[in-house]
Amino acid sequence: MAPVQLENHQLVPPGGGGGGSGGPPSAPAPPPPGAAVAAAAAAAASPGYRLSTLIEFLLHRAYSELMVLTDLLPRKSDVERKIEIVQFASRTRQLFVRLLALVKWANNAGKVEKCAMISSFLDQQAILFVDTADRLASLARDALVHARLPSFAIPYAIDVLTTGSYPRLPTCIRDKIIPPDPITKIEKQATLHQLNQILRHRLVTTDLPPQLANLTVANGRVKFRVEGEFEATLTVMGDDPDVPWRLLKLEILVEDKETGDGRALVHSMQISFIHQLVQSRLFADEKPLQDMYNCLHSFCLSLQLEVLHSQTLMLIRERWGDLVQVERYHAGKCLSLSVWNQQVLGRKTGTASVHKVTIKIDENDVSKPLQIFHDPPLPASDSKLVERAMKIDHLSIEKLLIDSVHARAHQKLQELKAILRGFNANENSSIETALPALVVPILEPCGNSECLHIFVDLHSGMFQLMLYGLDQATLDDMEKSVNDDMKRIIPWIQQLKFWLGQQRCKQSIKHLPTISSETLQLSNYSTHPIGNLSKNKLFIKLTRLPQYYIVVEMLEVPNKPTQLSYKYYFMSVNAADREDSPAMALLLQQFKENIQDLVFRTKTGKQTRTNAKRKLSDDPCPVESKKTKRAGEMCAFNKVLAHFVAMCDTNMPFVGLRLELSNLEIPHQGVQVEGDGFSHAIRLLKIPPCKGITEETQKALDRSLLDCTFRLQGRNNRTWVAELVFANCPLNGTSTREQGPSRHVYLTYENLLSEPVGGRKVVEMFLNDWNSIARLYECVLEFARSLPDIPAHLNIFSEVRVYNYRKLILCYGTTKGSSISIQWNSIHQKFHISLGTVGPNSGCSNCHNTILHQLQEMFNKTPNVVQLLQVLFDTQAPLNAINKLPTVPMLGLTQRTNTAYQCFSILPQSSTHIRLAFRNMYCIDIYCRSRGVVAIRDGAYSLFDNSKLVEGFYPAPGLKTFLNMFVDSNQDARRRSVNEDDNPPSPIGGDMMDSLISQLQPPPQQQPFPKQPGTSGAYPLTSPPTSYHSTVNQSPSMMHTQSPGNLHAASSPSGALRAPSPASFVPTPPPSSHGISIGPGASFASPHGTLDPSSPYTMVSPSGRAGNWPGSPQVSGPSPAARMPGMSPANPSLHSPVPDASHSPRAGTSSQTMPTNMPPPRKLPQRSWAASIPTILTHSALNILLLPSPTPGLVPGLAGSYLCSPLERFLGSVIMRRHLQRIIQQETLQLINSNEPGVIMFKTDALKCRVALSPKTNQTLQLKVTPENAGQWKPDELQVLEKFFETRVAGPPFKANTLIAFTKLLGAPTHILRDCVHIMKLELFPDQATQLKWNVQFCLTIPPSAPPIAPPGTPAVVLKSKMLFFLQLTQKTSVPPQEPVSIIVPIIYDMASGTTQQADIPRQQNSSVAAPMMVSNILKRFAEMNPPRQGECTIFAAVRDLMANLTLPPGGRP
């Protein structure tokens, strides 16, 4: 940047200015007030300040002055403080005004500077031109007046121009510049050849030392090379014999490859000096070549000795340490080293042998190389080792020392071998020469890894021992003993022999389930025969049989120091009382020496002994030769011991199992050999009878059992397999493996490591499994006997997939895609049922998972497979429909927006009774009946007394009317009219006689299924005319007293996992907590997972149920249905029960007297408890009732996106009507009494409203509006208001806060409400406003994307002196892959001024402000352009203008 000019065009100097105080310590100090004067003085010599530095100075100055003011002003008066502040402000302002002017000027400062530079450059050029002209003119007038040119050199010019050369060049110049012509290549070769002949003649006639015999003559030179010392190149300067030799090049060949790092050992200056010295000798001496050799050879020997000395020092420093010492070193004479110094090693005291190596130069004959001497002299046992130790070819002191100690180590090993041969004349040790080692076999035959390796440490000369597997402490003791006295090796080898024998035994059985130890703690060790064995023994514990041991005793073999003999014993111990107490030895028995009698062979089905088997001797591997066996390690395998262990491990489990079977008095055939002696087995002759089954079933099961055999299998022989062979299987499954005449059942039992194999637990597990087989067999036997008479629908509905005596798997359904598995659980002593899906339905959830616990309890009470199939048949379709109901908790349904309510809670009460709780307020009881029907009633009424309500539930008004809309007219059950049920007409109806006759007749006898001959209580499978509930044993959830179809007799469910009683209702936990897996088809994949897009709430955790709401209707009067005689689903009294006259509401007030021989007149149920009377629906009707479907009677465009079932729509409408009644009491609305049931009437200042369920469908809540002044409203406006209430307010998802917001709108003044209705019309019919760019939606609750004025879900309409409401605008035109842009606009309408503006609400930090700013500007411009008139509302006009003119920037989203 150019220098900055201040006032009067002065540059600011870069270094001027003092320091101010108060600014940051790291910033440069600002200029003092007088900096401008100093800047003006230094402007010519300084380039000026950078603008950034100047700005920084000004800021620091202002900051420092402000800090001074903060320190000084508190001490001054108020007037002085104000004066100081004004002065500071004025001064600072003037300063920054100047800075501003300077910055504006600085924009053009660069251009001005460039122009100035160009002008200055042009001025300098003009000055140069003028000065040059002046000088040339002066030179012409003064210096060149008398100057003359020479005559032209015409001949030279002609030569150059014609010939291109300069032949007339003077000779003196030619000789000094142009070199002479070189000799030719032929002349050069001839000269060198002649010189080579002169050199050869000279060499022949001169005395040459023999060391210089390696020479080469070439190119007029002779090259002498002495390997390892030097290389010299010489020549002569003529053919005269007296001409001296010339030394051309000298190279020293001595190298230090170990410590030299590749660098030259002789400096170039030293070589130059030697070169001069040798050249002087060549000039003066009579024998120049001899003298040259002596001089160079002497220097190279001294250099080699020096190299060896440096290597020794490095060897001592880095590797050998004190193990090698320099005894003496004379430079150029000798080097003496000592190795294997025992005193240094600290192993002995006093005099110690010292081994020396001396390297010196022979003083008598200097021409010899370095001489090596050993003290004491090396033995002559191995000439190759001695010869290597006497040479030093590679100039390596370490190699020389290693060769020396290698020869001495070989001598020590020979001495040790002689000691071993004195102990054993047949010893078979060998010496390895690569690394000095003595290999001593300990136990013949011996592998290489089992031999004792004795090495000699080359550094110290000490013996080092190695034996695989031996601990280091023992090796250290052996080394110390042998190094002190080599004869001590003998007892150590004797001890190692027994140790190696133990290791061989351990290695032989390491793959077997055993634990080996040298000692064993026994409480009676001293008194038991085990104590008399030798000390060298091994205890082998059989891990699968922890009470048994194999003891191996090892003994010496006379006259065979390298062999052992083994004796084997079998020992049993008793279990210790405590873990830390020793066991007691019981039996000790020696194995036979010849074990051929222990090898079994099966022949003709009998166990016989054979003499043809191979003989296993005591010696595990006979000695084949006297040499140590090197190939392989099979000689270490003790096959006798391995055979003993394997035999005990195989046979003893069967012995234990046989003893347990005998103790339990279970007859068996004993241990038998199978498969040519390779396996064993135990066959049971009879299995004890089972408890809990009939004698007939036990006999049938015993007759069908052909064989029961126990075998051992598995890698560790810890798995028992009991094979059961059955014949005459009562059921044949569809599996191909179940089609043969006999069935094989395999029961597997794993033995724990802590338990002996073949113990009592195996037998107990087998008996439990046999009991499970018997229990299931009894049910299967009864089921098989009933199969010929099974109803056709059950035969088509189900099939037997698998029956393997342990489990019965049935597949059922139209596609056989569901499965049920039945098996007996011996731990819980009851049947266990599991459900699943197969085939194409695999992976889906079974619909009966909801009532799995109830099915299991029912089957355990009455284990009848036919009854179970009938229940599955009757409940599959209802449960499929029930599982489609939404069970996801939702937020914002009530005024407590943070509380989640579960839409539907499925509470199974029994296998055929399912209770549905809707939002913890209404309850629906569904009873699954036979013949494809269900009975539905209001579960809020008590099952025992219809005059009482279940705590926590409320009756659903109009439920009976709603359910009768789904009644199938073709159903056999006769029904009464809806009006007759809800509003009783005359005391007796047209079909009263049928009802009276049915009451006078005695109830039909419930005949149980007749037992077939030979069966035990089996039922026939023909379907009786009445329901199956009355033909089977009653479960605890069914009362024995007769009631309408036994529908009201369900008491609180039994079992620990049942749903809670209605008297203490809480939200039921999900089925997954009961061990039931709900698949996608249950609830989460239903259409109810998609909520209304205007609702901000998704799945959340459920909370507790809501409390009682004020004003809930109560019911009174006894329920006549509780005392009805036995009824069936086909009985018409299910819909119109006849109560006792004494309990009738009209009893005692009737003036008519009935004849004594006639039943009392029929009293229709009161409407308050009419819904407690069950309504019979077919399965298809129930599916329609519970299946999500569009709202009937509504145009698809008007209906919301929340798809729900008719039952949810009805209950939701009832809840909304209940909320509306409570809201009317809280808001400023006037309630109007109405005689119509289920109708709510109220009025506002301008409207009368009537709210009731739709009479056609009972699934929507409809509003009928009547204005007080008919002239103020148009019919289409009222229709829009009514349709908006039906579709947007009281429709799904049925939120109470939408009602609160709508009632606030109804209470608004007429002109405001009319504008809101126009906005509602734009929402309901968006296609009618094609000229608008946006669609509008009236937000009755605050959406989550709205400005944070209140929690989401709260009412979005506030009506006081000003009106606040929210609109959601959605852009019409959008690219298909992208979602349409939507914005939330909070609008506030001022009733006093009549202006419509956007509410000024703080936005979230991460939200965009572009869209709200544009909306606010459009609304402000509309207010300016269209000022409101008195009594006119501008809401709709402003909103319509906003929808027409709002355009977001491209790519921008709110």
UniProtKB/Swiss-Prot annotation:
Chain segments carrying region Interaction with SREBF1: 500-824
Keyword Iron: no
Keyword flag rRNA processing: no
UniProt biased composition (Polar residues): 1024-1054, 1092-1101, 1147-1156
UniProt KW keywords: Activator, Nucleus, Phosphoprotein, Repeat, Transcription, Transcription regulation
UniProt cross-references to InterPro entries, sorted A to Z: Med14_C (IPR056877), Med14_N (IPR055122), Med14_RM2 (IPR055113), Med14_RM6 (IPR055114), Med14_RM8 (IPR055107), Mediator_Med14 (IPR013947), RM3_Med14 (IPR056879), RM5_Med14 (IPR056878)
Molecular function via GO: nuclear vitamin D receptor binding; transcription coactivator activity; transcription coregulator activity
Region (Interaction with STAT2): 188-566
Region ranges (Disordered): 1-34, 973-1167
Signal sequence bounds: none
Subcellular location as annotated: Nucleus
Motif (LXXLL motif 2): 1182-1186
Chief place of localization: nucleus
Composition bias, Gly residues: 14-23
Motif (LXXLL motif 1): 69-73
GO biological process: positive regulation of DNA-templated transcription; positive regulation of transcription by RNA polymerase II; positive regulation of transcription elongation by RNA polymerase II; positive regulation of transcription initiation by RNA polymerase II; regulation of transcription by RNA polymerase II; RNA polymerase II preinitiation complex assembly; somatic stem cell population maintenance
Physiological role: Component of the Mediator complex, a coactivator involved in the regulated transcription of nearly all RNA polymerase II-dependent genes. Mediator functions as a bridge to convey information from gene-specific regulatory proteins to the basal RNA polymerase II transcription machinery. Mediator is recruited to promoters by direct interactions with regulatory proteins and serves as a scaffold for the assembly of a functional preinitiation complex with RNA polymerase II and the general transcription factors.
UniProt subunit comment: Interacts with GATA1. Component of the Mediator complex, which is composed of MED1, MED4, MED6, MED7, MED8, MED9, MED10, MED11, MED12, MED13, MED13L, MED14, MED15, MED16, MED17, MED18, MED19, MED20, MED21, MED22, MED23, MED24, MED25, MED26, MED27, MED29, MED30, MED31, CCNC, CDK8 and CDC2L6/CDK11. The MED12, MED13, CCNC and CDK8 subunits form a distinct module termed the CDK8 module. Mediator containing the CDK8 module is less active than Mediator lacking this module in supporting transcriptional activation.
Protein name stated in the entry: Mediator of RNA polymerase II transcription subunit 14
Organism for this UniProt entry: Homo sapiens
